[in-house]
Design a protein with these regions (language model features):
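Short, charged, surface-exposed hinge/linker loops at domain edges
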Residues: 1-11
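A short N-terminal helical cap/helix-turn-helix that marks the beginning
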Residues: 10-32
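Conserved AMP-binding/adenylate-forming core of the ANL superfamily
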Residues: 13, 30-84, 101-106, 110
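Anion (oxyanion) recognition and catalysis
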Residues: 87
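Structured binding elements
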Residues: 90
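Short beta->alpha connector loops at strand-helix junctions that form conserved
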Residues: 96-98
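Active-site charged/polar residues at nucleotide-handling catalytic sites that mediate phosphoryl
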Residues: 111-115
Length: 116
């Protein structure tokens, strides 16, 4: 039924989330990649935005692969773009619920050793 040990095709093994999205873009650039509410993003636009986020994380924020960061945000298309863009840049993100108390936010960011 829902066997969690389904073997993936070789082309999917060892592929990052950003790599999988990029591969889908090459196959179907105009296909809807993500929908949140009434907003959508096709694969071409999603890859473009993920690339821009990755570049900003490295260039503007000064983070490097291996660094840690945090994002405090609700679910949105932009949230997904930041999480995947950070992953593509090699930055591990702690995803933090914006409804938490400020002290909890600080504790989570401290535990995650988030630079930003």
């Amino acid at each position: 039924m829902n066997d969690p040990l389904v073997e993936l095709p070789l082309s999917f093994q060892h592929m990052s989330m950003a790599g999988g999205i990029r591969a889908a873009m090459y196959r179907s650039p105009d296909k809807v990649a993500y929908k949140h509410g009434d907003r959508t993003r096709n694969y071409r636009d999603l890859v473009n935005r993920i690339d821009r986020v990755s570049a900003a994380i490295i260039g503007d924020l000064g983070l490097e692969p291996g660094d840690h960061g945090a994002i405090v945000a609700g679910n949105s298309i932009e949230y997904m773009e930041v999480v995947i863009g950070a992953s593509q840049a090699g930055v591990a993100l702690a995803t933090v619920n914006p409804k938490l108390a400020p002290a909890e936010l600080v504790d989570i960011c401290d535990d995650a050793e988030a630079r930003v």
